[in-house]
């Protein structure tokens, strides 16, 4: 989502609060919980899960392995739920031609660098750069090239923009900032 006027352009960036992340976290939690329950019930020797006959799942080695995978899955699931609740990666890009500044803000993980805030002058921007990676994991990312700093990504790698949409966004941003476009 973006908002634009004659002198100001604001791009809102969605972070980890996406439907796909919620689905993965929920699915991983339920699957891991099932593995832990099967491992626990095989250790206790009880058949509390009716659709698995207990005689087929003995504690050593199947129950131990299922418990291990279940616990590992619960840790990964809790990591996903934490990133969703903290909304890691969300923020905004602010381009202000009137004041001549660019502000980039992102939420990070809790700690010292929870708030990532970058501020640059418009005159330090060299170009808007499009990088295209071909192959199995093809990706297109829009970068802002700044003097004295490394290139800053403006789109996420998992943001599936078509080549036309990415070119349009790059052209509009380059026109707004009055800088050239580079393609790599």
Curated annotation (Swiss-Prot):
Gene from which the chain derives: ycf4
Q: What does this protein do?
A: Seems to be required for the assembly of the photosystem I complex.
Q: Which GO terms describe its biological process?
A: photosynthesis
- Of which family is this protein a member? Belongs to the Ycf4 family.
Which residues span the membrane? 19-39, 57-77
Give the main location: plastid
Q: Which GO terms describe its cellular component?
A: photosystem I; plastid thylakoid membrane
Q: Which UniProt keywords apply?
A: Membrane, Photosynthesis, Plastid, Thylakoid, Transmembrane, Transmembrane helix
Q: What is this protein called?
A: Photosystem I assembly protein Ycf4
Q: What membrane topology does the annotation report for this chain?
A: Multi-pass membrane protein
Subcellular location, in the record's words? Plastid thylakoid membrane
